[in-house]
A protein has these predicted regions:
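C-terminal and inter-domain tail/linker signature
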Residues: 1-141
Length: 141
């Protein structure tokens, strides 16, 4: 059952995406995710990364999308899962995804959906989906 501590964990997790941070990314990870945390975009063997890679990816947003914001639109809890529908927005400081999305100076706004598994009040696993195709269309328009 998801409790109040888990709700606080979820809100603290999303504070990581509202840059700039007041706390270190690694420090927040230590407080809100389990040591064996995984972040996944699918079920394939290369679709997940561990806690250290998550720290690297999120830290990278400080320079790649310095004004990034994540707004929680809806949050649902069931048993040991929390589902979040949110909106990610920002203005890339340069190209994204290895140059796939060139720098245009434009801002994007896309929907994101995350499914978090909670264990002991911390996030053990996240499945996430961001609509990066919509971002690409907005940035290239």
């Amino acid at each position: 059952m998801v409790d109040e501590r888990a709700r606080e964990t979820i809100f603290m997790w999303y504070s990581l995406f509202n840059l700039p941070h007041r706390e270190s990314v690694a420090g927040v990870h230590d407080r809100v995710v389990t040591p064996d945390y995984t972040s996944c975009t699918g079920d394939g063997p290369t679709d997940c990364w561990d806690k250290q890679r998550s720290i690297q990816v999120i830290t990278g947003f400080e320079t790649s999308i310095p004004d990034m914001k994540f707004e929680i639109k809806e949050r649902f809890a069931c048993d040991d899962h929390v589902i979040v529908r949110g909106e990610v927005s920002g203005t890339p400081a340069g190209s994204l995804f290895g140059g796939l999305i060139p720098h245009t100076g434009k801002r994007f706004r896309v929907m994101a959906t995350d499914i978090h598994t909670i264990e002991g009040g911390k996030i053990r696993k996240t499945y996430h989906m961001e609509n990066w195709f919509a971002a690409m269309l907005q940035l290239r328009a």
